[in-house]
C-alpha cells in the first residue's frame, strides 16, 4: 500500500481469509468488473443481477456482457435503500429465482448500495440453502462495509437486520469508476465507516483525513487508498471472527447508538451520519468512564466535521434511544454492550454502563 496518498492507484487485491477465502478487488471500469465476476463465479451457467433502480443501465450492460460471454444473465430491480430489505421484497426475489431456474450451481450478483448487497446476500444464503453471490457495491458505504464480511439480512418492524445469516461472497468488486457519479451526500456518509476503521485499528487513516479532508473524498485523491485501508481492517477482523462472537464486535464502534438513531428516525437518516453521531456518543461515554481524554473526543469531532459528517443528534430523548438500544443484537443478559476506545486505535467493550455515565455521555453528545 502506498504512502503517497496520490492518484497513482494500481489494481489491488485484498484477501479475506475467513471460512471461505475470497478476494476484494479494487480497480476501475465495467470491463474489469465483468472479468472478475466470471473468474469468481467459476462454472456458473445462470446469473441473476439484483439491482436498485438507478443502476438499471449498469445492470443491463453487465447482463449484456455476461450474455456475450455465453451465460444466461437475468436482472431483477428492487426498491431503493432500506425499503428493499423487507420480507416481501425477499419473497419477490425468491419468485424470480424460481422463474429463471436458478440452481445451486448458479450465482447472484448484488449490484448497488448496502441494502442491495445485504438483500442479494440473504437471497443467495437462503435459495436452495445457499448459492454463490458476488457483490458489486456502488456506494462508498457498501464498498468499505456492507459488501465485505458475509453479513446478510432484512429488516422487520422491530428493528434493522433482525433476520439474516452469515453468507460469504465469492468475490467483492470495488469499481472506483462508479464513485465518479455518486452524490456528495453519499460520499460523505460512506466516509463514516472509513473514519471508524481509523479509530478502531489503522490510525494512519486518521492522519490522511487530517492532512487533507477534501482529497479524502476524491476518487482521484487519497480516497482509493482509504478504501483499501478500511477494507483491510475489516478483512483482518473477519478472518479471525466471522460470526461476531468476539473480535468482530469492534466493527460496531458507533453502531449501538447509531442504529438507535436510525430506528428512531425511521431510517430517514443515512447510516453513515447515524454512525458518526454514534461514535461521538461512544467517545463521550469512554471519556465519562475515564478512558479517553477530552483531546481524543475533540479529535473525533474535528475529523468527522472536516468531511461533513454529523457530530450531534438531539432528535430524541435518551430514554427513547435506550429503548431501541435494548434490542441490539450485541446485548447479553439484558445489558447494553457498547464498543468504546481505551485509546485511539485500541477498542474494548463497555457492558451495562450506569445510568449516570449514559446521561453524561448523552448530555455531552447533544451539546447540552
From Swiss-Prot:
One of its GO terms (cellular component) is cytoplasm. Its main location: cytoplasm. Its EC number is 4.2.3.4. Zn(2+) binds at residues 193, 255, 271. Pathway: Metabolic intermediate biosynthesis; chorismate biosynthesis; chorismate from D-erythrose 4-phosphate and phosphoenolpyruvate: step 2/7. It comes from the Bacteria. Binds 1 divalent metal cation per subunit. Can use either Co(2+) or Zn(2+). Its cofactor is Co(2+); Zn(2+); NAD(+). Keywords: Amino-acid biosynthesis, Aromatic amino acid biosynthesis, Cobalt, Cytoplasm, Lyase, Metal-binding, NAD, Nucleotide-binding, Zinc. It is found in: Cytoplasm. Transmembrane segments: none annotated. GO terms for biological process: amino acid biosynthetic process; aromatic amino acid family biosynthetic process; chorismate biosynthetic process. Pfam families: DHQ_synthase, DHQS_C. NAD(+) binds at residues 80-85, 114-118, 138-139, 151, 160. It catalyses: 7-phospho-2-dehydro-3-deoxy-D-arabino-heptonate = 3-dehydroquinate + phosphate. Belongs to the sugar phosphate cyclases superfamily. Dehydroquinate synthase family. Catalyzes the conversion of 3-deoxy-D-arabino-heptulosonate 7-phosphate (DAHP) to dehydroquinate (DHQ). PANTHER family: 3-DEHYDROQUINATE SYNTHASE, 3-DEHYDROQUINATE SYNTHASE, CHLOROPLASTIC. NCBIfam families: aroB (TIGR01357). This is 3-dehydroquinate synthase. It comes from Corynebacterium jeikeium (strain K411).
